[in-house]
Amino acid sequence: MGLPWYRVHTVVLNDPGRLLSVHIMHTALVSGWAGSMALYELAVFDPSDPVLDPMWRQGMFVIPFMTRLGITNSWGGWSITGGTITNPGIWSYEGVAGAHIVFSGLCFLAAIWHWVYWDLEIFCDERTGKPSLDLPKIFGIHLFLSGVTCFGFGAFHVTGLYGPGIWVSDPYGLTGKVQSVNPAWGTEGFDPFVPGGIASHHIAAGTLGILAGLFHLSVRPPQRLYKGLRMGNIETVLSSSIAAVFFAAFVVAGTMWYGSATTPIELFGPTRYQWDQGYFQQEIYRRVGAGLAENLSLSEAWSKIPEKLAFYDYIGNNPAKGGLFRAGSMDNGDGIAVGWLGHPIFRDKEGHELFVRRMPTFFETFPVVLVDGDGIVRADVPFRRAESKYSVEQVGVTVEFYGGELNGVSYGDPATVKKYARRAQLGEIFELDRATLKSDGVFRSSPRGWFTFGHATFALLFFFGHIWHGARTLFRDVFAGIDPDLDAQVEFGTFQKLGDPTTRRQVV
């Protein structure tokens, strides 16, 4: 039958065997993509510098997801946290990728088998002899099995009872490692940044799923509810499944973009709000202040700042700086970070310490303005020299570096001072290698941005899909223009399959 492209899926209506087949094939494609993508990423990933060239700077997408679930070692002899290892075991990055590819192959074969052997006895209604599915019963089975999986993940994998645990870090993404997590059963479990909530919520949701599954297996739906919600129609299943998927996609888009314990910044990069709020800058200043309180010199206090913390406080790591259509990793944008030059402190000739006003997230260009501790403008890089009052030359601004590669170095010539003032707009100053990857100097987003954009977009599309298929199944008789209880001569439209020979006919 000549079906248009948008109606080809009607071939699996009233055909349970082949409906199962196409779903198994879909699983094969998803699993095969995941395994293949993992192998590709492992082929191009450089594990040599986990501090300045982490996975998220290199544009890795599936490696962070494996890592947060407890995979840290490679058969190549490296660990994601740095250093070398001798016995990575079977569940390395390559082991997980291989398992997905093997599983994909098995699903591929199973899909072919079920396509060929579609007319199985199990799909046949013994009362009518026609193919049919007991959808409420199948719903109960799926709910029970997903509940068992959910409970098992929370109770065993996350807690380390039988499994590796998950990636856990401090609030500033400095000490992350895979460790077991105890369930948080108090109110703290509702804090999205508390890892214990992951364990407790999976245990609770899994328990609920098991109980709900058993309920749906043992209790039949009332006839009026069954008919009212069209529980016998496979398109009802499609509609409600799409609802579950788009709801989950909206949720994870939020947890990724705003940050949570499930999306650690060491694996996915910092969030834009950490730049907007000066999150890392405040922690750096707090640590420097603590160092000065211990009678350290300014140079010594800044030298104790971890390079990893300083690197987070750089606008190039803000996922909102990447343009929507700028393909490639962050390293392809501003380059590969090589080292921290140190923290620049600017002073005018009167001795005021000056602070460069930082660039907001959604600006591509921003005026270079230097203010004192009270927020009063003391110097700038003017657009028009004729009207300048606060130019670096007039005010006599100098810059001195503390910590990093330029520790103790100072500059007084205006051209160099202005160069570092422009760079200080972007946060801490780093030396960036743009030659190796031929980086173009234009900021890119991190996998955090890609994931959010992709899931929010598809969630919206799937929302419309849910409405579409839900309306089709609820108002099928209305759309067909036929009363389902009417014995017409030929009930065009009541039957969903084009050319269905089972269409009821009545001799007049």
UniProtKB/Swiss-Prot annotation:
Molecular function in Gene Ontology: chlorophyll binding; electron transporter, transferring electrons within the cyclic electron transport pathway of photosynthesis activity
Q: Which residues cross the membrane?
A: 21-36, 101-115, 140-156, 203-218, 237-252, 457-472
> Principal place where this protein is found?
plastid
Q: How the cofactor binds, per note?
A: Binds multiple chlorophylls. PSII binds additional chlorophylls, carotenoids and specific lipids.
Coiled-coil residue windows: none
- Statement: the UniProt record of this protein carries the keyword Chloroplast: yes
InterPro entries for this protein: PS_antenna-like, PS_II_antenna-like_sf, PSII_PsbB
- Topological relation to the membrane, as annotated: Multi-pass membrane protein
Keywords on record:
Chlorophyll, Chloroplast, Chromophore, Membrane, Photosynthesis, Photosystem II, Plastid, Thylakoid, Transmembrane, Transmembrane helix
Q: What SUPFAM superfamilies does this protein map onto?
A: Photosystem II antenna protein-like
Q: Which Gene3D superfamilies match?
A: Photosystem II CP47 reaction center protein (3.10.680.10)
Q: Iron as a keyword?
A: no
A GO CC term attached to the entry: photosystem II
Annotated GO biological process: photosynthetic electron transport in photosystem II
Partners and quaternary state? PSII is composed of 1 copy each of membrane proteins PsbA, PsbB, PsbC, PsbD, PsbE, PsbF, PsbH, PsbI, PsbJ, PsbK, PsbL, PsbM, PsbT, PsbX, PsbY, PsbZ, Psb30/Ycf12, at least 3 peripheral proteins of the oxygen-evolving complex and a large number of cofactors. It forms dimeric complexes.
Give the record's family classification. Belongs to the PsbB/PsbC family. PsbB subfamily.
Check the record and name the NCBIfam families matching this protein.
Answer: PS_II_CP47
**HAMAP family (UniProt xref):** PSII_PsbB_CP47
Supply the name of the protein: Photosystem II CP47 reaction center protein
